[in-house]
Structures are given as C-alpha cells and as structure tokens.
Amino acid sequence: MAQNGRFSLGVRVLALLAADAEAMQTSTTLAEALGTSPVMVRRIFGALHAAGFIQQRKGPAGGAKLKKPAKEIGLGDVYAAVGSDWPQVDEKTIDTVLKRVHQDSLKAMNETTIANVAKKLKKT
C-alpha cells in the first residue's frame, strides 16, 4: 500500500477507535466499516501500536483501542508512525531544505488531531 494509503487508513482507524475509546474493536469490524481487508487493518495496528497510540489484546475478546487520548494524536504523528517516505537527496543544500520542509509539514499536520477528525466524521 502506498504511503498516502497507509496514512489515510491509519487516520481512519484511529478516528473509529476514538468514536468509542473504551471499547476493543477487532480488525474485522474496522475493516468492514472502512471497506478494506482485516489484514491491512492489522498491519496498521502494528504501526500504531509501535507508536504508542493503541493497545492491543489477542484472543477471542481481543482487538485494539486507543492508548493515548485522541486529542493528543496529531496527523503528523500518524504520518510518521505509518512509515513516512520523504525524498532524500545527496546534495547537502537541497537535503537541508527538504528536511526543514518535512519538519514544517509535520508540525502543520499536527495542528489537526484525531479528535478533530473523529468529530468531523461524526457530523457527516
């Protein structure tokens, strides 16, 4: 899955988890709601868990739920967690500029949180 697909899926998974922050949600339930494969959701779970955004439980009563409050998870954090592919070049001057642009982009993305996204989705 392309970077923007992983990012989009990560945001949507977190927004659904935020809608009922105390409940464990299975990858199958989330996949059905999002129109994707449970395998893709589980892959995203792995990245989100590694970033400390969700907690997981295996077994019949398993699933995932938010570990960190939705208002503390910025979109830039999600982008970084799911494996951001940012261009790198050998030219030091250009690479320095690209790194600054990347940092500024993540900072701007973090102005919107998963709580903001979940709230907007609830209205629709």
Predicted regions and their residues:
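A short alpha-helical element within helix-turn-helix/winged-helix DNA-binding domains
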Residues: 25-35
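Alpha-helical residues within the helix-turn-helix
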Residues: 32, 49-50
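Conserved segment of winged-helix/HTH DNA-binding domains
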Residues: 70-96
